[in-house]
Amino acid sequence: MATERHYSPLDRLLLQADTAMRTLLPFSGQPARPSPAIIQPDAELDEQQTRHIAGLMRINHTGEVCAQALYQGQALTAKLPQVRKAMEHAAEEEIDHLAWCEQRIRQLNSHPSVLNPLFYGMSFGIGALAGLVSDKVSLGFVAATEHQVCKHLDEHLEQIPENDGKSRAILEQMRVDEEHHAESALEAGGYRFPAPVRFGMSLLAKVMTKSTYRI
């Protein structure tokens, strides 16, 4: 029977640094699943459509950077081993989304946001603080965040042209995964945040979306 490996605080910090580099450096994240866009044909898009879709995908990419940092921060301070493992597993799935979005951004001749390091640091700190409060709050924060992401994905799917099958396939699969993460966090005992807290989180999300659409 395999024994679970126990990491020292230094080991965990080094792992966090490695994850941060793989999240922020171009083409560093290797997805476990192939991009859903692979089987979709190329679409004929005009310059304005291409620029707008690239902006939306840049927002989604930064959202995945934030999710990765959030999960890593929570995993660092989670009190129960099973909660820590759940956070780490969710972070691994977010790597897929991160890589898929970056691939699509490059295909559209654009680039990820230069603000990603800033948002990574902020999200990591929020995640670590949530984990320090309690695992229940930490899991609740995951659920609220993922529900907010699903809302953004729905809005973006309404804006992306029907003939852009590549972008739509990526966002549709992300939508399925994020909803699963949210429900799993609640089923694990996550706290359901009240409306005022969710509203505050939505305001912070708007800061991210407005700033990363162009840069």
UniProtKB/Swiss-Prot annotation:
Reactions catalysed according to its record: a 5-methoxy-2-methyl-3-(all-trans-polyprenyl)benzene-1,4-diol + AH2 + O2 = a 3-demethylubiquinol + A + H2O
Cellular localization per UniProt: Cell membrane
Residues bound to Fe cation 1: 64, 94, 97, 178
Single annotated GO MF: 3-demethoxyubiquinol 3-hydroxylase activity
Pathway(s) where this gene product acts: Cofactor biosynthesis; ubiquinone biosynthesis
Keywords: Cell membrane, Iron, Membrane, Metal-binding, Monooxygenase, Oxidoreductase, Ubiquinone biosynthesis
Database matches in Pfam families: COQ7
UniProt cofactor note: Binds 2 iron ions per subunit.
Membrane topology: Peripheral membrane protein
InterPro entries in UniProt: COQ7_proteobact (IPR047809), Ferritin-like (IPR012347), Ferritin-like_SF (IPR009078), Ubq_synth_Coq7 (IPR011566)
Highest taxon above the source species: Bacteria
CDD domains the UniProt entry points to: DMQH
Residues involved in Fe cation 2 binding: 94, 146, 178, 181
EC number(s) reported in the record: 1.14.99.60
Example of a GO biological process term: ubiquinone biosynthetic process
Main localization category: membrane
Cofactor(s) annotated in UniProt: Fe cation
A Gene Ontology term for the protein's cellular component: plasma membrane
SUPFAM superfamilies per record: Ferritin-like
Job description of the protein: Catalyzes the hydroxylation of 2-nonaprenyl-3-methyl-6-methoxy-1,4-benzoquinol during ubiquinone biosynthesis.
NCBIfam families (UniProt xref): DMQ_monoox_COQ7
Family classification: Belongs to the COQ7 family.
Full protein name: 3-demethoxyubiquinol 3-hydroxylase
Organism: Pseudomonas entomophila (strain L48)
